Amino acid sequence: MMFKQYLQVTKPGIIFGNLISVIGGFLLASKGSINYPLFIYTLVGVSLVVASGCVFNNYIDRDIDRKMERTKNRVLVKGLISPAVSLVYATLLGIAGFMLLWFGANPLACWLGVMGFVVYVGIYSLYMKRHSVYGTLIGSLSGAAPPVIGYCAVTGEFDSGALILLAIFSLWQMPHSYAIAIFRFKDYQAANIPVLPVVKGISVAKNHITLYIIAFAVATLMLSLGGYAGYKYLVVAAAVSVWWLGMALRGYKVEDDKVWARKLFGFSIIAITALSVMMSVDFMVPDSHSLLASVW
């Protein structure tokens, strides 16, 4: 029973979602030549770091989680694990994860993990989430760290490919998160969390969602234009972006914003999973003839 509680507090669903993006970044950089020990070290290392961040987040948010219908039954809210024990648990998970990334992958992968962790726990969870409408924007940077870590674990350098991945996954986070805030509007309102839909209104949030999806679409194409991914990836990226944008635009005419937001959120998961899979299998070796290479 205790094992289940210690697992729940790490938010396994979030860990799994991040692993898909880590695999995408890792295999994109590997270009068909997979170092399996490095692959395992990277996956486990990122999983432990993400788990640590989630436990710290649960500790920090236990007061506001009590006010939200979705989170009122979380382990720390119900007192199934003491706050002090959760802090020790989170710290041990983080140390293990960072050590695996440093010694099993490379220092760059570890430092990227540290930066993502600091942004998520230190900046987003401790301050921005509660005090600023821009909390989601800052938090998106930490959400984009896992695929970049996977990529840089292979390359050992932060190049244009890593920058494109950072842009893709950061931009994806915004409409994804705003959709959650819309269909969980009352929860965020009750907990006094200043997300955009609550502070500025759902109509303003819809405008932001549309603009971020357009920016996301452009960013996804950069992997092919830069010579990092092939035409199969390009077709899938274009298709999911157009479909997602179409869903966003239909939001201006719907009667039930919550139903629409749930559908938009659901497709966001499909979209990022499809991109992660396609960049894993349809990679290319960038050359001097790629469009971005001539600019970069």
UniProtKB/Swiss-Prot annotation:
Tell me the enzyme class. transferase
Matching entries from InterPro entries are given as: Protohaem_IX_farnesylTrfase, UbiA_prenyltransferase, UbiA_prenylTrfase_CS, UbiA_sf
Q: Which GO terms describe its molecular function?
A: protoheme IX farnesyltransferase activity
Membrane topology term reads:
Multi-pass membrane protein
- Stretches that traverse the bilayer: 9-29, 36-56, 84-104, 108-128, 133-153, 163-183, 209-229, 234-254, 265-285
Q: Where in the cell is it found?
A: Cell inner membrane
Record Pfam families: UbiA
Q: Which Gene3D superfamilies match?
A: UbiA prenyltransferase (1.10.357.140)
The record ties this protein, via PROSITE patterns, to:
UBIA
Protein family membership: Belongs to the UbiA prenyltransferase family. Protoheme IX farnesyltransferase subfamily.
- Extra notes? Carbon 2 of the heme B porphyrin ring is defined according to the Fischer nomenclature.
Q: What protein name does the entry list?
A: Protoheme IX farnesyltransferase
Origin organism is Citrobacter koseri (strain ATCC BAA-895 / CDC 4225-83 / SGSC4696)
